[in-house]
Curated annotation (Swiss-Prot):
GO MF assignments: rRNA binding; structural constituent of ribosome
Keyword Ribosomal protein in record: yes
Function of the molecule: One of the primary rRNA binding proteins, it binds directly near the 3'-end of the 23S rRNA, where it nucleates assembly of the 50S subunit.
The keyword Iron appears for this protein: no
Family of the protein in this entry: Belongs to the universal ribosomal protein uL3 family.
Protein name: Large ribosomal subunit protein uL3
Region (Disordered): 127-151
GO cellular component terms listed in the entry, alphabetical order: cytosolic large ribosomal subunit
The species this protein was found in: Borreliella burgdorferi (strain ZS7) (Borrelia burgdorferi)
Superkingdom: Bacteria
InterPro entries xref list: Ribosomal_uL3, Ribosomal_uL3_bac/org-type, Ribosomal_uL3_CS, Transl_B-barrel_sf
Key words, A-Z: Ribonucleoprotein, Ribosomal protein, RNA-binding, rRNA-binding
Lineage, broadest ranks: Bacteria, Pseudomonadati, Spirochaetota, Spirochaetia, Spirochaetales
Length: 206
């Protein structure tokens, strides 16, 4: 499956020929290299391993250095992904943004913005209690343990807690523009994560 590691630059808007304004997210790609292969005989399935963004030399361990010995002029990478069903590439080859030329829709995976510790209303969209005078609670969670049966709170019950900082995928984002010179891709709508965060862009599954 087609895929690249990119950086979310931010959002802007462009005008179509008919005058309609389209909100877009700009995703910029640093060079993505094939750094390895997985085979059916050795790993049980076939896939390509792609990497992007050089890792700081202080963070490169000896085992990681050994993995890159056979690759000339390619430094150890910070971000690594697996691409299944993508043929025609060998170790050391670069995957460029033009692979999305024939693609109309993409899935984008990123890490959502961290919001810190939040209450149930913000975190889970609960309605809360009555706002009127005399109510004992306004933004509280309410009961979590039912009555005599089961007389306990089940694991996984929605409560207040840390919000954000999770991996999230937005599917079927329309590809609006590809700029090969600037290694940029413009997709319609919003993408998970803050400006400058790294995302994985893949051809849409659906």
């Amino acid at each position: 499956m087609l895929g690249l590691i990119g950086k979310k630059v931010g959002m802007t808007q462009i005008f179509q020929k008919n005058g309609i304004v389209v909100p877009v997210t700009v995703i910029e790609f640093q060079p993505n290299y094939i750094i390895g292969k997985k085979t059916v005989d050795r790993d049980g399935y076939s896939a390509l391993i792609a990497g992007s963004v050089d890792l700081k030399s202080s963070k490169v361990s000896k085992p990681i250095k050994g993995q890159y010995k056979s690759l000339k002029d390619i430094e150890p990478k910070r971000y690594v992904i697996e691409l299944k069903g993508l043929d025609g590439y060998d170790a050391g080859d670069e995957i460029k943004v033009d692979v999305f030329k024939s693609v109309k829709y993409v899935d984008v995976t990123g890490t959502t913005k961290g919001k810190g510790f939040q209450g149930a209303m913000k975190r889970h969209n609960f309605s809360g209690g009555p706002s009127s005078h005399g109510s004992k609670f306004h933004r509280h969670l309410g009961g979590t343990g039912q009555a005599t049966t089961p007389a306990r709170t089940f694991k996984g019950t929605k409560m207040a807690g840390r919000m954000g900082g999770n991996q999230q995928t937005i599917q079927n984002l329309e590809v609006v523009l590809i700029d090969e010179e600037k290694r940029a891709l413009l997709v319609k709508g919003a993408v998970p994560g803050a400006k400058g965060s790294f995302v994985v862009v893949k051809k849409s599954k659906k």
